């Protein structure tokens, strides 16, 4: 039996050359680009007199800078308009397909590519965005890269990389009602730390992982990078195949059968050798919230902010910094903490199942007085599907704003921003200082259902304990 993991197999299939430095030249099967990290790469390519090597393997969208209240052109923000116009020009000049605004296929890059069937098992995927690890949910090996590497992939369709070790994250049991993939990944990061995965690829496996939908697996892999892992993945299985079948870029006919047969062969076998393994029990995980200034500073909704005595010595300076910035006291219960803004969306939790979970909480209830709550679908397809189900009406009736697709308040490179010391309940992926647009704004990461519960209650609350609507 083979001892190779999926990571080993995909790496070997895409290895172009071993370099004298010991690094590997790795072929990239799919290159995703957007308006923020591509302009400088295209400019550098032009300066060097180079062309895009494989435009047919490059797909673009616009997501980070788009406004979500009105997407009429030209944008009110001149810089945002310039960035989009530059992307449009670069794609046109280089023969790259752009899923632009109003195309019906525009969306956050890590929502758009999977729903179109672009992301498939066995691929190597690169994108100039930290959360490219999302695509590992399909059994792909996906890397976030910087602008200079975007240039390299455009020019050569390859990257210079060092092979990672592989840690298997085995999750037994089943998630309890009201507990979601977001809670699972926050729990994993809380346990292993934001640097725990440095030098590793994470293979997520076990009964609890197999039970997750594709969209939940995307949430899980999306945040692998927040735990320090370069990428995270799930072995492809029937759930993967059922999701992909019939999507625009998925194989069809005889090619589909051949593809599925090959995809099955990629999974890590029973005898696969891992460099490390960590086990979790899904049944004991509660709805989880970040209280501090890194995704690793998380606690269950029924817990209190940890004291210094409960914090490992090496983490105490960061904990003290988080107490001050978040204006929280050691030992303070997280439940009941007032919030100002509630944001549902992002490449972590802006898919249809996320909106359904939040809408189920919002239905028949009202957003608390003084709370700004809004929902931003992850793509035009997600928005259309949600509207076809009437989810937009559910949210509006409850007092949420229903917005146009985009990255929105995840990173505030657009008009959606916190103001002053506002505190947000957010379904996004990062809670760093200033992440959501205000230098002093505060972010609590949680699942979409928990964000909806916070909006209704006006404060952090356990979604499982909401009174009947």
From Swiss-Prot:
Binding locations of [4Fe-4S] cluster: 347, 407, 410
PROSITE patterns: ACONITASE_1 (PS00450), ACONITASE_2 (PS01244)
EC number from the UniProt entry: 4.2.1.33
UniProt superkingdom: Bacteria
MF terms (GO), sorted A to Z: 3-isopropylmalate dehydratase activity; 4 iron, 4 sulfur cluster binding; metal ion binding
Top EC category: lyase
InterPro entries to which the protein is assigned, alphabetical: 3-IsopropMal_deHydase_lsu, Acnase/IPM_dHydase_lsu_aba_1/3, Acoase/IPM_deHydtase_lsu_aba, Aconitase_4Fe-4S_BS, Aconitase_4Fe-4S_dom, IPM_dehydratase_rel_enz, IPMI_cat
Reaction catalysed by this enzyme: (2R,3S)-3-isopropylmalate = (2S)-2-isopropylmalate
Essential cofactor(s): [4Fe-4S] cluster
GO biological process annotation, one example: L-leucine biosynthetic process
Cystines in this chain: none
Pathway(s) per entry: Amino-acid biosynthesis; L-leucine biosynthesis; L-leucine from 3-methyl-2-oxobutanoate: step 2/4
Pfam families per record: Aconitase
CC cofactor note: Binds 1 [4Fe-4S] cluster per subunit.
Subunit and partners: Heterodimer of LeuC and LeuD.
Task performed by this protein: Catalyzes the isomerization between 2-isopropylmalate and 3-isopropylmalate, via the formation of 2-isopropylmaleate.
Family: Belongs to the aconitase/IPM isomerase family. LeuC type 1 subfamily.
Protein name per UniProt: 3-isopropylmalate dehydratase large subunit
Lineage, top ranks: Bacteria, Bacillati, Cyanobacteriota, Cyanophyceae, Synechococcales
